Amino acid sequence: DERYGRFRNWCEQQAESYAKEVKGDYIQETVQVTDTWINISDKGGYQYPHHHANSYLSAIYYVNFDMARDHVPTYFTRDTNFINAPALNVITGKTTEYNQNNEVLSNEGELVIFPSQLNHGYDENTGYNRISLSMNFMPTIVTNGDYGWRCVNLNQSERKKAFDEKEGLPNN
C-alpha cells in the first residue's frame, strides 16, 4: 500500500534523525524498519516492562485513544546497571536524571523513538481501544570506519536456514 510506504519512509527518516541528532551515533547510510506490529489494548489491558532484543532503535506510533479519558502514559525505566556497549563492570547504584524512571504522555499521531534496550511498558488502561503501532529499526550498515557489516532483510528460506543452523537442525 502506497500510504504505508510513505508512513514507513517517514518513520525511517525520523529514526535516522534521532540516531544522528539525539544519540549522536555515526550512521553511515540509513536505518530501516525491520518489523512492525499493532497493539490493541482494551480496558484493563497493560504491558509489562520489556525491551527489544536484536534491534537498535524502537518506536511507538500512537494511533487511537481518547486523550481526555482513556490514555495512560508509556513509562521508560533505565536501571543503574543498564547495559551499554562496551559493557563496563563498575559499581553503580546512584539514580541520576539519565537513569530514573520517566513517563511519556503522548497524543494521537505522535511517534516516540527510543533505544531498543530501554525497558518500557504501560500500566492498566482505563479506557477502551488504545491502539498503537510499534516497530524496530536497524542501521543498513554498522561500521567503525575500518570494518562493518550490512543489515539485510532475509527471505523466508534464508530465515528458515538461519534458524535451523542455530538450532542444530538438518537442512531440508
Question: Whereabouts are the PLM-identified features?
Answer:
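Short, cationic low-complexity segments
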Residues: 81-88, 153-172
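Catalytic core of non-heme Fe(II) oxygenases with the double-stranded beta-helix
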Residues: 39-113, 123, 139-151
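Residue-level detector of short, conserved catalytic/binding motifs and their immediate flanks
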Residues: 36, 57, 131
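Residue-level signal for beta-strand positions within conserved beta-sheet cores that form or flank
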Residues: 34, 70-72, 129
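Signature of the catalytic double-stranded beta-helix
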Residues: 1-45, 49-52
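An acidic/histidine-cluster motif and surrounding catalytic segment
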Residues: 136
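Ligand-binding loop in jelly-roll beta-barrel domains
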Residues: 119-132
